[in-house]
Amino acid sequence: MPSIKEKTLHLILRRIAPRLVDLLGHSIQFRFVNTEYPQERAWRGESCIFCFWHNRFLLMPYFYQRVRGKKNICVMASRSRDGEYISDVLKGFGFRVARGSSSRGGDVAVKEMVSLLKSGLDAAVTPDGPRGPRYRVQPGVVLLSQLSAVPIVPVTYDVKGKGRLRSWDRFIVPMPFCRGICMFGEPVWIDGSADEEERKRMRSRLESDMRAMDARAASLLGATPD
């Protein structure tokens, strides 16, 4: 049975953390780039699989609501304690959560997300999470796209002022009241008949696309890419 301390923490994460994330996002002067495709699919009621690096997770709920204008999304979170905390925050935004990762429960989470994608919900995945290596796309997101026949839409952001945690991914913590870029990439479709070699090729392409987006976002800000 959860202790009073644990119950209090879960309550804070669900009710207060989402408001703080929204406040942080609104305080930053963001320029949004290439939002047309995800917005058009939203107007048509079509799903997307949003794909972003683990260290850029913090503001993604804010960006999603700004660009898609809804809360119909399922986010994959690991079965670790950290994943439980992240789940609380996501549920506070009104999002659904599928618990699983490359190391624990991934197959179950993928099946759940495929079903939800086919029913019209969006999905969100960190392809290098939950343990890395940083900026390396793991197989799950490509398989998810293939099984659901829904395109992957890569997303990144960068800000002029930021701190970083001493974690494996060097998690980005944006500073308020600075300038930022939020960028959406071109959709990546995975053919339903793709074999293992083709899936590997598409993983490599997605990884290259996402790193190029990171560099471009940094360049537009006049910052140094990591």
Predicted regions mapped to residue ranges:
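A short, well-structured juxtamembrane/interface segment
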Residues: D22-E46, L59-M60
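Short, flexible, glycine/charge-rich loop motifs used to bind or transfer phosphoryl groups or to couple energy/partner
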Residues: P38-R41, F63-Y64, M113-S115, F171
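Non-catalytic C-terminal accessory region of glycerolipid acyltransferases
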Residues: M1-S27, G92, R96, D107-D226
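Residues in well-ordered beta-strands of folded domains
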Residues: R31-V33, C51, M76, M183-G185
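Short, well-ordered alpha-helical scaffold segments within catalytic/effector domains
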Residues: T35, F57, G83, D107-V114
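Short amphipathic alpha-helical segments and helix-helix/interface helices
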Residues: P38-Q39, S87, V141-V142
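Catalytic core of membrane glycerolipid acyltransferases/transacylases, capturing the structured
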Residues: R44-R104, R164
